[in-house]
From Swiss-Prot:
Lineage of the species this protein comes from: Eukaryota, Fungi, Dikarya, Ascomycota, Saccharomycotina
Low complexity: compositionally biased ranges: 465-481, 718-731
Gene giving rise to this polypeptide: CAF120
Domain PH stretches: 75-204
Localization in the cell: Cytoplasm; Nucleus; Bud neck
Function (record text): Acts as a component of the CCR4-NOT core complex, which in the nucleus seems to be a general transcription factor, and in the cytoplasm the major mRNA deadenylase involved in mRNA turnover. The NOT protein subcomplex negatively regulates the basal and activated transcription of many genes. Preferentially affects TC-type TATA element-dependent transcription. Could directly or indirectly inhibit component(s) of the general transcription machinery.
Protein name: CCR4-NOT transcriptional complex subunit CAF120
InterPro entries according to UniProt: PH-like_dom_sf, PH_domain
Organism (species): Saccharomyces cerevisiae (strain YJM789)
Cysteine disulfide partners in this protein: none
């Protein structure tokens, strides 16, 4: 049966279910009719979950602590009859408020309840249907979850008067999830003390095991964090993250922004606080929704299944909370669930919240160092039982506390402190736990309760048990059957010794059973109907199998837990020490050699376990020798491997890391945080780097390591420089890669690689300092659809920004340059252009002037440029023909080859841009100033219209005009003596800045005028610019010469092409 499910589980018909064991000796007839065959299979409608170890792998460090958690889930603390009244419903409204007599069994933190009247109705053996009805009633218990419950005892000072007029005494007030509240009343003081001790102990063991689980979780998962050493240092900065929080179990979750503030004082009583805000905008303390000002305990909540360990992020904080700044703090259980982040493991998220929270409240040794000692009450691992012991304390160990009058007014935290004091005194005497068990067939049993937990008993003792299903039964059984319970069969000599023990059979009366509606009218059953122990002559006792670890009266855990009066004598109890186990004795003097032999069948493998400290045979358990340390571990813990790693580095900043740093990174190579330097430093893996000893896993990791090394060794040079496609597509000159030498070292597997190259290509297109492609093209070149036609045979070549204009470019003698083919995106691989031009000085020295024919001896290449490719002027240039533009009937020079780059965009230099059709009037010019105000800033756009001619510098009118140095020829003979025309990108939009009017004779700038562009040929070659003399004030403006851009402007003597 599932613990937290609200559905009632119904057993099958009696034909398929031979019988059930009695919950208690609830009458002689009732107990005899609920005999159970322990070897029979019990089938339920609910599927029985298999062992988590068989379904999913669990870290070896967590196996012992999970075993203890499941042992606590199945522990049978106490059972008996009492009255219960539900006061409030889950929504806070009044319930029926009627007393009901129930029979209860406390299993772990689950209180199972049956209606005592219904059970009593089917005790008549003469009724043929009573057995069937009894099984149906017994299979439908009501559960109350006490995991997060709050207990309060009532006494005469509370003055709670019932309807009968009497005070409510011997009662407990239990507040559970949401707003549910129950009143439990017991028949006498002894019953009240027993139940109070059992419930207090189960809550203490639950919280202690959760803290121990947190320590094991941090130990096993925290080592996977690459920055765990930094995380565990004593730091003072605040931690902020989005969380979901709820105040009390069952309350709704609310999303808020948590800020963990560290304490500025090192004093013991000064703590930080956790402020919870509704959003991350207002994070001042006066805007806090709630503030956790103190914490008594803080731990990660075990998710009840090993499969959910790495995905659960729930944290429980037991402390004081303030909802208003001026009000006093309230004791609350706060549940915090940090939000998961993308591509971040859940254990990474929860650990990064746990450590700062422990630091701010100075819990468990933080912020200095996490405590790992079992003897320290402030440690996460305090009092943890040493396997094969599975429990912290017995129920009767708490009877002195419940008998004390002062305990009636203790809070939950005070109860925890007093229980810790008892445990600490016992540990000082060599106490290692209680209730050893040897019939473990699986280290991780099912965490769910079944019929065996509710009804089965062994030897009439209500001792805690663990229902472990064997692997064979769980594999062969169907989904609707529980695992078969296996028992240890002792030899005849051992059985005879146990049966002939001198321990007397004690008969005790149970508390009075209330069978009337009024709680003060009671009926006491007969002596024969209530007995906590059955005599040896009883026929029911002969059917039971004695336990392997039998105990005397003073050593049994729960046979006195039933409501009876037994004086508590702590001197009669002897601590079970490891020395007695080594001699084969328990505290009651029984020889356990036969029992220890049964442990050989246990399928439990725990690295560096210290089972050998408690057993005579050291080979009882298989221990991984690869992960064991050379030094012998002490017996102060059952999680030896965890404690050693938990107490040493990197979990303490005062000690160094165990082993080399490379081994640590190799062992946890799947860490969530790793720097690139640390990743590259991992060269190889060795079998000693892994502690699990799994050869198959080592082989897989070795294969992944070799693959990673091959990927890291793979660079750009294996793709760009030596590929066959490069040899086919053409050779590259040394000049082409002068600025790209660093690209060979790029990592192709970098996710930002393509984005970086695209940005670089964009920068090349608009970079004024980049190289400008110039090409040698034929004069008879046809229109390409770009609005440009060739005019003259002009030789152009690549120009680099880092070279001076007097330096001759170097070319590779092995690979002659063919820039026409390099820039052509449609060139087929393996085909070269039919050109025979050479790079001799005679070919490049002669620059054709305007109207000058091309030398007949010069050979030109037959380059064909594709149409309408990356055309920035496609809108205005699509209708151009070979006859030329309407404004310029002459043919123009074609553009150079496409600029190299990832986007293969044409070079912005020397590309003619056709004016807008509506520009029928002369364009206004800028006021005189520096036309190249952008300087060497390549990404700055031009500050003037593409067709606006910049004005000369007024401060130096006689200085030769020095245009932008980007288009300066590289000093080739016969090249340009001055500089090329200014850079005008083809795809720059029209200037949106307000344009100044034409300068008038009376204006301050009237003595300046635009340059006539007389010495600036249209085809791109220019000499030194000679600024004209300043114009006189009284003289008439000279007519502009019909040269340059002015020849396209309409005037009285020029025919307007758009006027037709």
């Amino acid at each position: 049966m599932r613990i937290f499910s609200g559905d009632n589980k119904v057993v099958d018909s009696p034909a398929s279910n031979p019988g059930l064991m009695s919950p208690s000796n609830f009458g002689g007839d009732f107990g005899s009719r609920l005999k159970v065959n322990v070897t029979s299979k019990k089938k339920l409608n609910d599927s029985s979950p298999t062992s988590p170890m068989e379904s999913s792998p669990v870290s070896p460090e967590l196996v012992p602590i999970l075993t203890l958690l499941n042992a606590h889930t199945h522990r049978r603390y106490h059972e008996g009859v009492f009255l219960i009244l539900q006061d409030l419903n889950n929504n806070g409204t009044h319930a029926a408020r009627k007393w009901k007599d129930v029979y209860g069994v406390l299993l772990g933190t689950q209180l199972a309840l049956w209606d005592a009247k219904e059970l009593a109705e089917f005790t008549d053996p003469s009724c043929p249907v009573s057995e069937k009805k009894l099984k149906e009633v017994a299979s439908k218990p009501t559960y109350i979850n006490l995991t997060d419950a709050t207990l309060r005892t009532l006494d005469n000072s509370d003055n709670i008067v019932m309807e009968c007029g009497k005070n409510l005494t011997n009662a407990l007030v239990v507040s559970t999830t949401l707003k549910n509240r129950y009143f439990l009343q017991f028949g006498n003081k002894e019953s009240f003390n027993a139940w109070n001790s059992a419930i207090r102990l189960c809550l203490y063991e639950c919280s202690s095991l959760q803290e121990a689980y947190t320590g094991a979780f941090i130990s096993s998962r925290g080592a996977k964090l690459g920055d765990i050493r930094i995380l565990l240092t004593n730091r003072k900065y605040d931690y902020k993250d989005w969380v979901s929080v709820r105040f009390g179990a069952g309350m709704p979750w609310k999303r808020c922004y948590a800020v963990i503030s560290q304490s500025s004082s090192k004093k013991k009583g000064h703590f930080g606080e956790i402020n919870l805000y509704e959003n991350d905008k207002k994070v001042k303390k006066n805007h806090a929704m709630a503030t956790i000002v103190e914490a008594k305990a803080l731990y990660a909540v075990y998710p009840s299944s090993p499969k959910l360990i790495d995905s659960s992020t729930i944290i429980k904080v037991v402390g004081s909370v303030k909802f208003e700044k001026k009000e006093s703090a309230q004791e609350k259980d706060v549940f915090i669930m940090p939000e998961k982040h993308q591509a971040v493991p859940s254990y990474d998220t929860i650990i990064r919240f746990l450590i700062p929270a422990m630091d701010t409240f100075k819990l468990y040794g933080r912020p200095e160092k996490l405590l790992s000692s079992k003897n320290d009450p402030h440690s996460l691992l305090f009092g943890l039982p040493v396997l094969p012991h599975i429990y912290y304390l017995e129920v009767e160990d708490l009877l002195p506390l419940t008998n004390s009058v002062s305990s009636l007014h203790w809070s939950n935290n005070e109860w925890k402190e007093h229980i810790s004091d008892i445990l600490q005194r016992k540990i000082a005497q060599g106490y290692c736990g209680c209730n050893s068990t040897s019939n473990i067939t699986s280290p991780l049993p099912s965490p769910f309760l079944g019929s065996a937990d509710l009804f089965e008993r062994a030897d009439g003792v209500l001792s805690p048990k663990l229902s472990y299903g064997s692997k064979s039964s769980s594999n062969n059984s169907s989904k609707n059957s529980l695992p078969k319970r296996e028992r240890v069969k002792l030899s005849s000599s051992s059985e005879q010794d146990l049966n002939n023990s001198d321990s007397p059979s004690i008969k005790r009366e149970s508390p009075p059973l209330v069978i009337s509606e009024s709680p003060h009218k009671v009926h006491t059953p007969t002596d024969a109907s209530f007995r906590t122990r059955v005599t040896e002559g009883s026929p029911y006792a002969k059917q039971r199998h004695p336990k392997a670890f039998a105990s005397s009266v003073n050593d049994s855990p729960s046979d006195r837990a039933k409501s009876r009066t037994v004086p508590y004598n702590n001197n009669d109890r002897k601590a079970t020490t490891p020395e007695k186990f080594e001699r084969g004795e328990t505290s009651c003097g029984k020889n356990v050699d036969e029992s220890l032999k049964k442990v050989r069948n246990m399928k439990l493998e725990i690295p560096e376990s210290n089972f050998d400290k408690f057993m005579t045979d050291k080979n009882l358990l298989s221990v991984d020798s690869k992960s064991s340390n050379e030094k012998k571990l002490s017996v102060e813990s059952d999680l030896s491997a965890i404690y050693e790693k938990y107490s040493n580095g990197p979990f303490g900043h005062t000690e160094g890391l165990n082993g080399s740093s490379d081994e640590t990174y190799l062992r946890f190579q799947r860490a969530s945080v790793h720097s690139e330097s640390n990743y590259n430093s991992r060269k190889s893996f060795t079998p000693s780097d892994f502690s699990n000893g799994n050869e198959e896993e080592h082989a897989v990791l070795q294969e992944l390591n070799s693959l990673t090394q091959r990927i890291n060794e793979l660079g750009m040079e294996s793709i760009n420089s030596n590929s066959d496609s490069d040899r086919i597509n053409g050779s590259y000159s040394q000049v082409d890669f002068d600025n790209n030498n660093d690209e060979d070292d790029m990592n192709l597997f970098d996710p930002d690689f393509m984005a970086q190259d695209q940005l670089r290509a964009e920068e090349r297109d608009y970079n004024k300092d980049d190289r400008t492609p110039l090409a040698k093209v034929p004069a008879a070149f046809q229109s390409t659809g770009l609005g440009i036609t060739p005019d003259d045979d002009i030789e152009r070549q690549y120009i680099t920004e880092h070279r001076s204009r007097h330096e001759v470019p170097k070319r590779s003698p092995e690979k002659p340059s063919n820039p026409l083919e390099i820039g052509n995106p449609y060139a087929k691989p393996g085909t070269r252009l039919n050109t025979t031009h050479t790079h001799s000085k005679t070919d490049r020295s002669i620059t054709p002037q305007r109207g000058q024919p091309v030398p007949s001896g010069q050979q030109i290449s037959s380059y064909v440029q594709p149409a309408n490719i990356n055309s920035p002027n496609k809108m205005y240039g699509a209708n151009n023909s070979a006859m030329g533009s309407p404004r310029n009937p002459k043919t123009r020079a074609p553009p150079g080859p496409y600029n190299q780059g990832w986007n293969n965009r044409p070079s912005p230099s020397n590309i003619y841009q056709r004016p807008h059709p509506s520009d029928t009037q002369p364009q206004a010019y800028h006021l005189p100033g520096n036309p190249y105000s952008t300087g060497n800033r390549p990404n700055m756009q031009a500050q003037y219209h593409p067709q606006q001619v910049p004005m000369p510098i007024p401060q130096q009118p006689n200085r030769p005009y020095q245009p932008y140095a980007m288009n300066t020829h590289m000093g080739s003979p016969g090249g340009y003596a001055g500089a090329a025309p200014p850079f005008q990108p083809a795809n720059v939009n029209y200037n949106t800045r307000p344009q100044q009017p034409w300068p008038t004779p009376n204006s301050p700038s009237a003595h300046y005028r635009p340059p006539p562009n007389l010495n600036q040929p249209q085809n791109g070659s220019a000499g030194y610019y000679r600024p004209p003399a300043p114009q006189l004030q009284n003289s008439q403006a000279r007519p502009q010469k019909k040269d340059g851009f002015s020849q396209f402007m309409p005037s009285a003597t020029t025919k307007n092409p758009y006027a037709q």
